[in-house]
């Protein structure tokens, strides 16, 4: 009797194991890595003023008496809310860092910087993504 029970248990085991493995589904393929959005700067300018979100008096050279300048940026390609940064440099010295929200795939924004008459020289505004990648640099001169 003991041998018969052992034999039945063995038979059930050999029948069950192949059946169970035959019913096992293949593992799903690994998820495709999400391709990050690629931000681009579709428009950028240094200007003496802003009317709404439109730069006024855009140029690449300004008088030292200008008083205040605006760095305008139009961002394309954001598929979720993110940030861009404006880094204002005078003669390669960082003068200001400004974080600006980007809330849609096409977004216009700007920052401003007060310019003292003694700040003549070479300037640039670097536009960076949230993770610090340089998107565009806008050089300009204060005379």
Name what the model sees in each region.
Residues 69-76:
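Short edge beta-strand/loop segments characteristic of extracellular beta-sandwich folds
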Residues 81, 120-122:
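Extracellular Ig-like/FN3 beta-sandwich strand-entry sites
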Residues 86-90, 127:
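Conserved aromatic beta-strand anchor motif in extracellular beta-sandwich/beta-rich domains
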Residues 115-116, 124-140:
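Short, exposed beta-strand-loop hairpins at the edges of beta-sheets
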């Amino acid at each position: 009797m003991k041998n018969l029970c052992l034999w039945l248990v063995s038979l059930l085991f050999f029948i069950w194991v192949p059946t169970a493995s035959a019913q096992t589904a293949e593992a799903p393929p690994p998820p495709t890595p999400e391709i990050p959005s690629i931000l681009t700067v579709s428009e950028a300018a240094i200007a003496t003023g802003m009317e709404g979100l439109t730069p006024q008096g855009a140029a690449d050279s300004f008088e030292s008496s200008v008083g205040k300048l605006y760095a305008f940026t139009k961002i394309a390609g954001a598929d979720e809310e993110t940030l861009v940064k404006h880094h204002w440099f005078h003669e390669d010295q960082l003068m200001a860092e400004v974080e600006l929200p980007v809330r849609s795939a096409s977004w216009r924004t700007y920052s401003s910087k007060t310019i003292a008459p003694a700040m003549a020289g070479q300037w640039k505004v670097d536009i960076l993504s949230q993770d610090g990648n340089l998107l565009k640099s806008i050089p300009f001169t204060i005379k």
